Amino acid sequence: ASVEYDNEEDSPQIDARAHRPLDKRQEAAPTLRPVAPPISGTGYQPRPPKQDKQAMKKGPIIYPDAGGCKHPLDELGVLCPTGCELQTTLLKQEKTVKPVLRDLKDRVAKFSDTSTTMYQYVNMIDNKLVKTQKQRKDNDIILSEYNTEMELHYNYIKDNLDNNIPSSLRVLRAVIDSLHKKIQKLENAIATQTDYCRSPCVASCNIPVVSGRECEDIYRKGGETSEMYIIQPDPFTTPYRVYCDMETDNGGWTLIQNRQDGSVNFGRAWDEYKRGFGNIAKSGGKKYCDTPGEYWLGNDKISQLTKIGPTKVLIEMEDWNGDKVSALYGGFTIHNEGNKYQLSVSNYKGNAGNALMEGASQLYGENRTMTIHNGMYFSTYDRDNDGWLTTDPRKQCSKEDGGGWWYNRCHAANPNGRYYWGGTYSWDMAKHGTDDGIVWMNWKGSWYSMKKMSMKIKPYFPD
């Protein structure tokens, strides 16, 4: 018999028989058969007796189908399957197995793709988890810092509520009580002034007989008491009343401006500043007017006095603690109305700071230059001559700063500003949110209003 090969498996197939023929091309020569061992035993046993045929009958033995051929007799069981039978069986199985294998391969490929996708997704989730954990850690740190800060704020607020606010309330109550007393005092003063104005204007105190061109001339004529006098700078003008300070620096000072209690409103028009306004003096319990009132002498009168000869001006101020400073200008001239009462000052001495010539010492450069008063024209709310050049009519120094003055853009000094009790004030207290108090910035800054301020002039005599 010849050897056949299966095209599918490429393995030899041998025709099965009771013996296995030798394939000399692929197998070596068989070895010699060994000698059979001797038969063991001592002899035959006697024949057993016959048994009952019925007893000898056996039931059929059922063998499971092992996939091969059966013996003719069922008792002999299943023959060993031949190669052909195995091949046929395998071919039958192959038709079923191959689609299953292909399906399994497809499933394995899909599973592989799915596994790759899942791996990438897991990696992405892992990275996000790492980032989330880091972010959470950072958030925990920020939250901890925020909680710490909030606790500090809470403690600060609690401390203020427990300690500072009650103290501030006590201070405010004291301030309110003080203001109430001052209001009552002003109401009484207004009532007194109203009663006084109901009667014809007559001198309520004696006026000295001595008079002169100005207070220095009166001093030289023997008038050495500080009180109200009558002066006449030249024969062509009507005599008028002034207060003469005969004590400060050898006396002879003509008081041209005075602020001391807020009893007079200095937010006046051009013509009022031209003529003058306020109360020259009043009696302090004596028989003469020994106490100056609040007033502005008048631009025409001031201009005329400075034209008599070289004139100096002394500006004195006092804060609400009683501290005093002054600014002395050895040269002081006010030009006439045709020149808009232009201001000229020179030769500063004093400890208040040279606000009129140098501007506000807190400012620098152009901002400081804007606050210099020397050389400026006089301005009132109805006559804008300041250095604030703008097309907006609301932007006017005199309107915003409370009085008439030689404003630039706008001031370092504001003697004719609003009167604020207590000194310190703020933008929300001001009518226009500006520093409109009685200010001398070089001493107390913008937001401190003086208790007292005055301007006095006298002839200047070089040493």
UniProtKB/Swiss-Prot annotation:
Site (Cleavage): 17-18
GO biological process, one term: cell-matrix adhesion
Region (Disordered): 1-56
Cystine bridges: 205-289, 215-244, 397-410
SUPFAM superfamilies referenced in this protein's UniProt entry, alphabetically: Fibrinogen C-terminal domain-like, Fibrinogen coiled-coil and central regions
Record NCBIfam families: GGGWT_bact (NF040941)
UniProt-recorded name of the protein: Fibrinogen beta chain
Gene assigned in the entry: FGB
